[in-house]
Curated annotation (Swiss-Prot):
Gene3D superfamilies: 1.20.1270.10, 3.30.420.40, Actin, Chain A, domain 4 (3.90.640.10), Substrate Binding Domain Of DNAk, Chain A, domain 1 (2.60.34.10). This is Chaperone protein DnaK. It comes from Pseudomonas savastanoi pv. phaseolicola (strain 1448A / Race 6) (Pseudomonas syringae pv. phaseolicola (strain 1448A / Race 6)). It comes from the Bacteria. GO terms for molecular function: ATP binding; ATP-dependent protein folding chaperone; unfolded protein binding. PROSITE patterns: HSP70_1, HSP70_2, HSP70_3. Residues 605-615 have a biased composition (Low complexity). Induction: By stress conditions e.g. heat shock.
């Protein structure tokens, strides 16, 4: 079986991992870092930048630089959280034909799974470069509190990226896997508190030894899919904007370039305040008016930051209480608290978690890498490389259908262990009713309209009968990915209808296939771009070496030879400026051909007069005592 990689597709950063020789390895990307910013940029020349390269140019290209797109995945445009996001991001969030939230770049509408696929492609290539072989299968993580639409959309993103997604696994569960694999035998209960860039999850997980097998059972999960580090950044940005307005009377919110610089400064300040008690944000030439350029200089203390975000941190406590209640466990019975997600590095978050659970969180789990590592372990379990692990996850939200009076009737309660299957018999509401509409819902409210609508389908041709007589059996089947399959059957006729829930949200099969084709075209374009760059580099090197050879040859070169070489050099330099790889290669060959006689002449002369050839080397000998300095790149630790 092929290698199955583990990918943490994060809101702010993403990470890829593999199980190798029994050990989990987090793979460094081409830039040498173990995490990759989940940022995608579309350059004017059509090039797609992903990760650090996209982040670097964000200030000069804010409208076409997309970040935190995971917050939009599987969501409707009209949702309050999406409307709130529209006010905060410099790129354009638009309404798709099916009502979903999409983004628009350079006049082209794109679905969030299509954009997330670019990050997954980067993770896939990172793994392939390390392993030296093609990678086609992956386990991808999602927030535990993701609903069905969001899980389906994540799976679609994997397909568009050319990956067969073997399993969708919840992020806290993955972190528990990474933590629990090497722990001593015996039963213990852990809390995974996962506050990432865009989402918050908390899970109560029991790790037990059953017949020599590590069993990870999720007892309960809760969370908020629109609460994370991005919200903390927004509070800081708002503070900086207000301070600047007080000082200069100018509002920066209408200036996308200024807002992008502020976003980067806010993120940097937030990170610095986790280890320092004060920092200064200094952004020269942030804007200008008739009197000249304006500069933003703001000092901010850790206590000020904490006062700005205290309510956000407090919002994580209610889900913790609910998860403990659903699990039927007192907080005193928790053995370990595991912090996951970059935002948990904030001292205020750590303090609140310690106070709530009555114990310090463990420090031996890397909050940025644990999720990807757990995904890699699950991949190894599915591949058969790890045999002593059993993972029992849960469905995070109640699933049911709309019944008479606009009531939601539950079929599968929240925190039910998955995979699971449940059937229930319903009947008609009117006499001689010949069809029923099955409206599938997800959520905790009794009123159907207050829950998330996952889809509708009809069961028709029911034989005429008084109301309440026909027996319609509705079956809900949740697979190991947490994705729902629904069926309805008329028990009298045996007629049935079923769907995988993605009907009223998400991408159609045709759209996914088109995006897969587009991704393949992009891969081909990337390959061509690399080949063109290689040809240009080869041409540049030849131009440089030929000019040096002509200069060294001096009067040994005839006027005719010099003219021919100069013409070939000019032709090659012109070709290098163009985009035609074949033309560059042809001009390289032409220059090599006309300069070959000169090279042969120089070589023959050196062979006849070795002393003369050695003389320049002797003159340069004095430099041999110079020692090359060794420089080490210092990376910012986040």
């Amino acid at each position: 079986m092929d290698r199955i990689i583990g990918i943490d597709l994060g809101t702010t950063n993403s990470c890829v991992s593999i199980l190798e020789n029994g050990n989990v390895k987090v793979i460094e990307n081409a830039e040498g870092t173990r995490t990759t910013p989940s940022i995608i940029a579309y350059a004017n020349d059509g090039e797609i930048l992903v990760g650090q390269s996209a982040k670097r140019q964000a200030v000069t290209n804010p409208h076409n630089t997309l970040y935190a797109v995971k917050r939009l995945i599987g969501r409707k445009f009209e949702e309050d959280v999406v409307q709130k996001d529209i006010q905060m991001v410099p790129y354009k969030i638009v309404k798709a034909d099916n009502g979903d939230a999409w983004v628009e770049v350079n006049g082209q509408k794109m679905a969030p799974p299509q954009i997330s696929a670019e990050i997954l492609k980067k993770m896939k290539k990172t793994a392939e470069d390390y392993l030296g072989e093609a990678v086609t299968e992956a386990v991808i993580t999602v927030p535990a509190y993701f609903n069905d639409s969001q899980r389906q959309a994540t799976k679609d993103a994997g397909r568009i990226a050319g990956l067969d997604v073997k399993r969708i696994i919840n992020e806290p569960t993955a972190a528990a896997l990474a933590y629990g694999m090497d722990k001593a035998k015996g039963d213990h209960t852990v809390i995974v508190y996962d506050l990432g860039g865009g989402t918050f999850d908390v899970s109560v997980i029991e790790i037990a030894e059953v017949d020599g097998e590590h069993q990870f059972e999720v007892l309960a999960t809760n969370g908020d899919t629109f609460l994370g580090g991005e919200d903390f950044d927004i509070r800081l940005i708002d503070y900086f904007v207000d301070e600047f307005k007080k000082e200069s009377g100018m509002n920066l919110k209408g200036d996308p370039l200024a807002m992008q610089r502020l976003k980067e400064a806010a993120e940097k300040a937030k990170i610095e305040l986790s280890s320092s008690t004060q920092t200064e944000v200094n952004l020269p030439y942030i804007t200008a008016d008739a009197t000249g350029p304006k500069h933003l200089v703001v000092k901010i203390s850790r206590s000020k930051l904490e006062s700005l975000v205290e309510d956000l941190v407090q919002r994580t406590i209610a889900p913790c209480e609910m998860a403990l209640k659903d699990a039927g466990i007192d907080r005193s019975k928790i053995n370990d608290v595991i912090l996951v997600g970059g935002q948990t590095r904030m001292p205020l978050v750590q303090k609140l978690v310690t106070e709530f659970f009555g114990k310090e969180a463990r420090k031996d789990v890397n909050p940025d890498e644990a999720v990807a590592m757990g995904a890699a372990i699950q991949g190894a379990v599915l591949a058969g490389d790890v045999k002593d692990v059993l993972l029992l996850d849960v469905s995070p939200l109640t699933l049911g259908i709309e019944t008479m009076g606009g009531v939601m009737t539950a079929l599968i309660e929240k925190n039910t262990t998955i995979p699971t299957k449940k059937s229930q018999v319903f009947s008609t509401a009117d006499d001689n009713q010949n069809a029923v509409t099955i409206h599938v819902l997800q959520g905790e409210r009794k009123q159907a309209g207050q829950n998330k609508s996952l889809g509708k389908f009809d069961l028709a041709e029911i034989p005429p009968a008084p109301r309440g007589v026909p027996q319609i059996e509705v079956t809900f089947d949740i697979d190991a990915n947490g994705i729902l399959h629904v069926g309805a059957k008329d028990k009298a006729t045996g007629k049935q209808q079923s769907i995988v829930i993605k009907a009223n949200s998400g991408l159609s099969e045709e759209e996914i296939q088109q995006m897969v084709r587009d991704a393949e075209v992009n891969s081909e374009e990337d390959r061509k771009f690399e080949e063109l760059a290689s040809a240009r580099n080869q041409g540049d090197a030849l131009v440089h070496s030929t000019r040096k050879m002509i200069a060294d040859a001096g009067d040994k070169v005839t006027a005719e030879e010099k003219t021919a070489v100069e013409a070939a050099l000019v032709a090659l330099e012109a070709a290098i400026k163009g985009d035609d790889k074949a033309a560059i290669e042809a001009k390289v060959e032409e220059l090599s051909k006309v300069s070959a006689p000169i090279a042969q002449k120089m070589y023959a002369e050196q062979a006849e007069n070795p002393e003369a050839a050695a003389k320049p080397a002797e003159e340069n000998g004095k430099a041999d005592d110079v020692v090359d300095a060794e420089f080490e790149e210092v990376k910012d630790h986040k």
